[in-house]
Amino acid sequence: MKVIPAIDLMDGQVVRLRRGKAKDKTVYSDDPVKVALTWEKDGADMLHIVDLDATLGRGNNIDMIRNITDAVSIPVEAAGGLRSIDLVAGALEGADRVVLGTLAFRDRDALREILESYGSKKIVISVDHVKGKIMVDGWRENTGINLVDAMQGFVGAGFTEFLLTDVDRDGMMQGPETDTLGKVCRMSDSHVIASGGITVPGDVKSVRDAGAWGVILGKALYEGKVSVKGAISC
């Protein structure tokens, strides 16, 4: 299973939010490149970089993301605010792949064009949910779309890479919800990355046993509860 540290960027800093709320922010570093190099040195398989300012429509961290992708040699996936074909194209000039959430649910024509242009391995569909219902727009809008139905539709359309985030558990350090994860992983041979709730090393094993292809390490990593090396050895 791939071990993937998250680097969430806001105002050029590495931060973590609780349940995606900007007012509930903790700053962990003023040097995102140094953080990225640390996780790479520790053995991370990939980096998951989220531009929270772009997600929330309050600017972007494009230059900082470019600095990170220039500095590391491991793959980088970029997420946050990629809601147009042009923004996706720009992100892929530096990142190895992009994570699409709001665009995937609101603009199927653009999504189809992106798939045709870049192929399924470059596109990660973000299926963020609260109690099995899809959330978009920086987790501010509940679409009412059923998670399993959405996954089946995307798999049928040719997508193979997914990021599953349990919004209620993100940044809360309450442990992952593995029942839904297991159900989603059993649906197809697609790659599913689990995100949200990882708190102790045993949680990493739990999501691996549920069938996850990868796991995002967020707040627990920055709080010292889980290490990259420890997650790899689980």
Swiss-Prot record:
> What keywords does the record list, in alphabetical order?
Amino-acid biosynthesis, Cytoplasm, Histidine biosynthesis, Isomerase
Which residues are responsible for catalysis?
A: 8, 128
Indicate the principal place this protein occupies in or around the cell. Answer: cytoplasm
Record flagged with keyword Amino-acid biosynthesis: yes
Q: Where in the cell is it found?
A: Cytoplasm
GO term, biological process aspect, one: L-histidine biosynthetic process
Presence of keyword Isomerase = yes
Q: Name one GO molecular function term.
A: 1-(5-phosphoribosyl)-5-[(5-phosphoribosylamino)methylideneamino]imidazole-4-carboxamide isomerase activity
The record's listing under SUPFAM superfamilies reads: Ribulose-phoshate binding barrel
Enzyme Commission numbers on file: 5.3.1.16
Highest taxon listed in the record's lineage = Archaea
Listed GO cellular component terms? Answer: cytoplasm
Kindly tell me the pathway this chain contributes to: Amino-acid biosynthesis; L-histidine biosynthesis; L-histidine from 5-phospho-alpha-D-ribose 1-diphosphate: step 4/9
Q: Which CDD domains match?
A: HisA (cd04732)
As its record notes, the protein acts as a catalyst of:
1-(5-phospho-beta-D-ribosyl)-5-[(5-phospho-beta-D-ribosylamino)methylideneamino]imidazole-4-carboxamide = 5-[(5-phospho-1-deoxy-D-ribulos-1-ylimino)methylamino]-1-(5-phospho-beta-D-ribosyl)imidazole-4-carboxamide
Regarding protein family, the annotation reads:
Belongs to the HisA/HisF family.
**NCBIfam families in the record, alphabetically?**
1-(5-phosphoribosyl)-5-[(5-phosphoribosylamino)methylideneamino]imidazole-4-carboxamide isomerase
> By what name is this protein known?
1-(5-phosphoribosyl)-5-[(5-phosphoribosylamino)methylideneamino] imidazole-4-carboxamide isomerase
Species source reads: Cenarchaeum symbiosum (strain A)
